[in-house]
């Protein structure tokens, strides 16, 4: 298969491929899709950057919309993580901080930490939170970051500056 099928450039920017990050954390479907859209926003089709971010937000909102699905997804993800950590499966777990620094050129210690990075770090944190409420709050925080990113992109498109 060609690279547009197996390794499209909009997912392989930098050292880490998006799918490798997602597999290493066993994200549920909606969260994996949200991260995918955050990472590819503006890269697959520059004219659809806002649309990709809106899709990411839609997946995050859908994930927390149904409490039963939300709780079950968190439970199954935690069970998968425990199982695979006990069995050496050879899948590298890339930290959210390393992944976002690679994708967006940011660091935890810099003042210019993009909303996309914050959203991905919060989504990842939600999968490791000690309880459902903290997971929910992390996802709510990620939604706010995506909203802020959408505003920044619209400002840039409209030529507005803050």
PLM features: what roles do these ranges have?
Residues 1-162:
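Intrinsically disordered, low-complexity regulatory regions
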